[in-house]
């Protein structure tokens, strides 16, 4: 990752663009960086814009308003990547947009932002604006409607400050974004200290764009990131979570982790992960190095993970630093149990949903579950296979092995057992149901559920054969006497 920080490099291809350099896609070679006060227009064939965005653009232009394709969509189109969203910037204030398009929601009218619904597709329309004073490191206290040039120079990075004029079929550049896109550089617009002071989330966005595009961060921008890194802790948990998700589900997730650490952004956000640095592991099991390097490698071996799976991989060894000890060798006793509790705290801090949190905690808690997979009682294996997130656990175990010693025999054996379990067909009907036990005197409640689960475990383990009810009832009577159930001679 050394070439991704602090200096430029020869233009190169981007993920998804094949071997063509960016300069080729832009139709020209690099020129000098354009100052903020200059306007540069470069002819470019019209992009394949969504029908909804084109309809809104036409409506604005026909009403006498200026309308330009803006931001990330322009960047991606020039890189040869299909944008996921098409945003427009316009001279029309939000109220005017609402007049022109009845199905408009003013989601951020105080900041000049509206969403127009066209055939069930949303198009974001933002009024050209200049941001006034920032006080909270997130948003301006007020905005002033203005022109395209001032709108461009208040944005975060030069490659995101480009417009496309659909009428004149030209890229409009006020900030030198074309040159930085051709060179492959992440550069803050204007004064980087000011940009990061305005919105501290930009610190994380710089990292994400750098690793996802494969662009180095320009030197002055990088130095400003280091100066402002501690302030990232003031970004709201929800915004941090969203940026982490974008980084962790991207193929460059391991590079993102390493660069977050080098940028001094990891410790303010995830000190538990930062603590993995320098924590040695037994070399016979972990020839790759310390816990941090292992974690980065595990992330790199995931294949198109969901966010909970990727976060579970990031946190799976979070319990190792506090449990480190040297006995006969380096050991991390019960790091899975402690790690699960720590992971739950991280998930709560990041405001994850309960479903996401449950999956992450399950993955951390059970990431060693396959160590004795062949020796497990069939009932225990079945309970593991029936877990909602078992397949995520299997994917994590494969990545865990590939990110250390490379021996994947454990997850392979687990997968064999799992496939055999699936091939056996639908689950068998229970031998007993609660009503059958209640008829002979057992009481409803948690203990009844425990008894029924024990019956099914006994059948899986071969203690009960067949599907007959009477032998199962006798098995229950022998192990869960009714005297205990009624409190006669047992605990009240």
Q: What are the residue ranges of the model-derived segments?
A:
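Catalytic cores of the polymerase beta-like nucleotidyltransferase superfamily
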Residues: 1-492
């Amino acid at each position: 990752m050394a070439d991704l920080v602090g200096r430029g490099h020869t233009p190169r291809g981007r993920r998804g663009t094949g071997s063509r350099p960016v300069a080729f896609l832009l139709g020209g070679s690099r020129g000098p960086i354009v100052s903020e006060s200059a306007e540069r227009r470069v002819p470019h064939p019209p992009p394949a814009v969504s029908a909804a965005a084109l309809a809104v653009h036409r409506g604005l232009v026909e009403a006498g308003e200026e309308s330009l394709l803006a931001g990330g969509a322009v960047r991606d189109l020039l890189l040869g990547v299909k944008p996921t969203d098409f945003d427009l910037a316009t001279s029309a204030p939000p109220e005017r947009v609402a007049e022109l398009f009845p199905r408009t929601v003013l989601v951020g009218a105080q900041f000049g932002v509206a969403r127009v619904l066209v055939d069930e597709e949303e198009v974001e329309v933002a009024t050209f604006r200049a941001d006034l004073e920032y006080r909270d490191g997130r948003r301006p206290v007020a905005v002033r409607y203005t022109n395209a040039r001032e709108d461009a120079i208040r944005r975060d990075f030069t490659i995101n400050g480009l417009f496309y004029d659909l009428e004149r079929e030209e890229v409009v550049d006020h900030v030198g974004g074309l040159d930085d896109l051709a060179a492959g550089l992440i550069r803050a617009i204007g004064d980087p200290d000011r940009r990061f002071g305005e919105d501290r989330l930009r610190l994380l966005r710089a990292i994400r764009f750098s690793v996802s595009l494969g662009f180095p961060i320009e030197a002055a921008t990088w130095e400003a990131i280091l100066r402002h890194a501690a302030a990232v802790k003031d970004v709201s948990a929800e915004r941090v979570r969203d940026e982490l998700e974008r980084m962790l589900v991207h193929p460059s997730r391991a590079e993102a982790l390493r660069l977050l650490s080098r940028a001094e952004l990891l410790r303010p956000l995830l000190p538990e992960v930062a603590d993995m640095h320098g924590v040695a592991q037994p070399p016979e099991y972990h020839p790759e190095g310390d816990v941090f390097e292992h974690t980065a490698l595990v992330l790199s071996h995931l294949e198109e993970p969901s966010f909970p799976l990727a976060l579970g991989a990031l946190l799976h060894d979070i319990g190792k630093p506090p449990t480190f000890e040297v006995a006969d060798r380096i050991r991390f006793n019960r790091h899975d149990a402690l790690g699960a509790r720590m992971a739950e705290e991280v998930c709560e801090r990041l405001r994850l949903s309960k479903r996401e949190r449950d999956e992450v905690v399950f993955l951390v808690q059970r990431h060693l579950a396959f160590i004795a997979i062949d020796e497990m009682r069939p009932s225990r294996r079945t309970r593991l296979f029936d877990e909602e997130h078992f397949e995520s656990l299997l994917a994590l175990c494969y990545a865990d092995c590939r990110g250390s010693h490379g021996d994947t025999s454990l997850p392979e054996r687990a997968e064999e057992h799992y496939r055999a379990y699936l091939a056996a067909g639908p689950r068998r009907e229970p031998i007993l149901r609660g009503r059958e036990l209640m008829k002979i005197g057992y009481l409803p409640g948690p203990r009844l559920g425990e008894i029924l689960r024990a019956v099914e475990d006994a059948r899986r383990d071969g203690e009960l054969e067949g599907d007959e009810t009477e032998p199962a009832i006798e098995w229950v009577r022998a192990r869960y006497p009714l005297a205990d159930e009624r409190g006669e001679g047992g605990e009240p």
